[in-house]
Amino acid sequence: LQSSYNALMGQINPHFFFNSLNGLNSLIRAGEQEKTLEYLEGLSNVFRYILQSNHKTLVSLDEELQFVKAYTYLLGVRYEHKLFFSIQVEETYMRKKLPILSLLPLIENAVKHNVISKRHPLQIQIYTKSDNWLVILNSIRPKMEETVGHGIGLKNLRER
């Protein structure tokens, strides 16, 4: 179990940590005190969830979406006015169980493999369909250069 957890943690984009600290640094330098405090709270929630994830294999959709909201808030600060998230999940689905951190690789891949600019903002939607489907949909604007990756995040998600 511990080795599986360590493998999962290694798959979370290591640049996320550094980008988060750079985002925090930018907010501090800009004197954005209120935004800095919100950002710190979001960062704290993200890391708390990740650290506590070694004790769970399944979580409710509600728990996973709370994590996603904190994570996407951090991304939103980094990609201000270029990245938009929409979550529309019916209350009846919130108790459904899914593997912990299962939405993260889908969001990371959308960000990693698409152009994100003011002219072409990335839109990611998470919603439910009446036939028990959870849908993660994003606008597709592939980057011109191929992003090198090994597909480990999606492979891990399929295995879980």
Where are these regions (language model features)?
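Two-component histidine phosphotransfer core
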Residues: 1-159
